[in-house]
Structures are given as C-alpha cells and as structure tokens.
C-alpha cells in the first residue's frame, strides 16, 4: 500500500508509491498464435482422436469384462486414475467401486485377506469416492501391542499403498496416523538403501506429493513417464494416456491463446506495471481445478477471475493510498459501471474488466438457458474479499500488529480461496444448484480447511519476501509475537493446522449432505494446486524456476509417442 510522507519544503503531503519488485512475465507472447497459425485441427489431430476412441473402447472392455478378479480391477482403476484417464470411464468406475463397497467387509475385512496392497488400495479408492469405509480394516496388520507388523516392511508396494491410504484420514483415526508414521519412516529407509530400484520413483514422488494432495495433470505427466517400468503396466493404457494427454494439452494451448490475447488487450503491463503479470500461471492454477475438456467454460471464467483478483490484490497490497482503497472497496460494493469515472484512473483499468468478466459469464449462462444466481453469489464473495483487503491496508497504515487470532480472522478470507471456491461453481451448469451455493456460503469444513491451507502455506514460504517492503505481519510474525517463540518453532506449529485442515477436507467429502462430488472436487483441487505452488517457496509470485518447469511440462511439451 502507498503511504503519505510529510515534507516541510513541498506540499503538505505527497504520495510515495511502494514497489514490490515482482519479476515480469516470463512468457511474453509464447501462447498467442501468430498470424494464421491459430491452433487448428490437423489431419494428424483427427487421426489421434480416432485412435483415442479405439483405445478407449479397448479399455472399456477391460473394465466391463465379467471374468476379471477384484484385485486386478482395483489395480486397473488405480492406473487409470493416475494416468489422468478416469474422466473417460466415470460410469464404469462408479459401478465397479460400488460392487467393491458392497462386498468390502466380506472380502477385505477377514483376517484371511492379508494382502496389504489390495486392502489399502481398495480403502483409498472407496474413500476418494466419498464412501465412509472404516479404517479398522487395517487392525489385522498390527500385532498384539497395536504396532504395525515389521514383516510388512518387505512389501514395498503394499507399504506405498498404505502410505497413500493414510492421507485420507479424518480426525480421531489413530490407526491411520500410526500407519502414516510407520510407512513414512520405512519408505524413506527403502529409498536410502534402494535409490535406483524400480519402485523408487513412485516412492520418492509419493513422499513429496501424496496422491491425495496432488493435482491431476502433474500426477499424470509423471506417471506416464515411469509407467512402462512396472511389471503390471498395460500397453493399451500407456498408449491411451499419451494420446489423451497430448490432445488435452492442445485444448489447453488453444484456450491459453485466447486468455493471453484477452490479457494482452487489457494492457496491464503498461497500465498497472506495479502488479504481478501472471496470467499464464493463473491458467495453470485453474487447469488444476478442472483440466477436462468439457470444463472449458468454467476454466476460462475462473482464470479471468483469479487473474483480475491478483491485480486487485496488488492494488491493495502495494500501490493504492488509504483513501483510494476506500474508494475502490466502495465501488466494488456498489458494483456499478456508472461510477467508473469516480475512481482514480489507474483503478479504472482493473474495475471495468472485473465487472465485464462477471457480466460476460452471466450473459453466456443466460444464452445457454442456465440460471444466473451463481454470479450473484460470486460477486458477494468478491465484495467480502475486498473488505478484508481494506482491513489489512488499514492495519498497515496504522502500523498495527494484530494478535495471531485477529490476523487469522481476516487473513482466512483475504487468501481469496473462499471467493475462488464460489466462483469455481459458477459455470459448472445445472449441477451447481442454489442449494450448493447456499451450502458454500456457510463456510463448510472443506472451505475453511482450504482457507487454512492456503493462508498458512503462503505465509510460511512468502513472509520473508513480503517483509522486504512495508507489509502487515504474516501468520509467522503474529504467531511468534503472540506465543513468544522463534521463527522455526512458528513454522512447526503452523504446519499442524495445515495437517488438521486436510483432515477437515477429507471429513467433508464423507458427509452425506455435502454437494455432489464434481463440486467438492473443485474445492479440493484448489488445495491440491496450492500444495504444489507453495512447496518451499511462493511459486506464484516467483514463477521463473520450478513453476516454469511445471507449466512447460504440462502446457508446452507433448509426451513423445
């Protein structure tokens, strides 16, 4: 936020604008088609699409064959999901998992069924689908003292499956907490002793990015690259995965060309040079929320919303004066294009596009014969967001140091993911009912969990950079002061609520009154992307290294045939 500096020789006060020193966009016009080279379907693309359909039919036969044993079916489903293909076979997978659920206790609950991989994998697959399967099924792998049997250590694939299953725990499931501790320790030991073993790639990846906390495109890109190494791999699945990944990538490239052209026409680089220019990173973020081609409309809408949110965040956080920020907050509350001229000129460049994007979404939904009430919910969420932005700006102006509790009461909203959750429902079609928006507006566990994960993950990795300019204290500084502890202790303590937040999110997904899974997945996917972008550093603000590599692997480089 800009501050006033008094001068005895000049005017009564002058405005000193802050600068955060954000690096410029690293992408330039990379994704904007030049001349007549707009992404068009070629004969090669058409052949690939035909090949895709043929391969899909082969896999569908594998899923519907009546003579396949249950162990093989759950392994097949796991591979399909890891390879990013499950959206092609949703009905078949739902039917199969319902059969697994119906026979679960009879099949896996007996002491005779002691295959750890089968039990843990089926548990994870069912929990992922919202089936509240009891974790007591793992007690048969414990000794009389309640400890996991050491003989399990030799079953590396089983240990890996138990590790992944443990990340679907809810509060009070001590057996899964013990399982996580047990498997983490022994899988790390396995890696140290067998760094080049075939399973080492899977183990290494899981320890860093458990499946429950990973987003689809990154999981698929990695698994496709190593799947051929494993004795259980199926060539038809690998061929389908490569074909599908590359075709979906072309869909994303075409959309990103449209998005970057829209962004370039807004000319924020010249009109608002103090703000982060991260539209490509925003699109990448939103492909983590929904990557499937059928979600093109919500993907474009949410990308525009998050891109403009980033600009407006920087107006509050870096550039605007207290008086200007009050004006902007009031204008957003009124949501009226007729007051555009009352704003400072630089703010108009962000205010008008904001209103335009929501109006565009509303018009498109009306043309499709869909109700538009979701846009109103998203507007209200955006208004609440900017109120917290202003609250933090006032803290900075007053040089106020909030308690940790005060800070979190505001910062859980200013992290913007509550607004993004609402906005993620807007273009989802008829499944996003008024009841779903009402449920979301009451801050359910899954949204609060997401907010905690976002805010604390961001603050832990980003607070030192923010402290290089005038900025409010982060959760780290507030916790240090409130509890009289060191920075390292604060980090450790703040990671505990993040762990609990994931459990909250898992719990919400098992509630019968929760909205349909396609809606819950949007909220959960926001947390998954955050888990990647804020891993070790702020990969959104500082996107020129690891984030660049991730974007390149998902949105630029096709997978070789």
From Swiss-Prot:
Pathway: Secondary metabolite biosynthesis; terpenoid biosynthesis
Descriptive protein name: Sesquiterpene synthase 2
Reaction(s) catalysed (UniProt annotation): (2E,6E)-farnesyl diphosphate + H2O = kunzeaol + diphosphate
InterPro entries, per database record: Isoprenoid_synthase_dom_sf, Terpene_cyclase-like_1_C, Terpene_cyclase_plant_C1, Terpene_synth_N, Terpene_synth_N_sf, Terpene_synthase-like, Terpene_synthase_metal-bd, Terpenoid_cyclase/PrenylTrfase
Cofactor note: Binds 3 manganese or magnesium ions per subunit.
GO molecular function term, any single one: magnesium ion binding
Cofactor(s) of this protein: Mn(2+); Mg(2+)
Binding site for Mg(2+) 2: 313, 317
Main EC class the enzyme belongs to: lyase
List of residues binding Mg(2+) 3: 458, 466
DDXXD motif, short sequence motif: residues: 313-317
A Pfam entry, by short name: Terpene_synth_C
Coiled coil: none
First and last residue of the signal peptide: none
Function: Involved in the biosynthesis of kunzeaol. Produces mainly (-)-germacrene D along with gamma-cadinene.
Tagged with keyword Manganese: yes
GO cellular component: cytoplasm
GO BP term (any one): diterpenoid biosynthetic process
Binding locations of Mg(2+) 1: 313, 317
Record localization: Cytoplasm
Gene3D superfamilies: Farnesyl Diphosphate Synthase, Terpene synthase, N-terminal domain
Main location (coarse class): cytoplasm
Keywords, sorted A to Z: Cytoplasm, Lyase, Magnesium, Manganese, Metal-binding
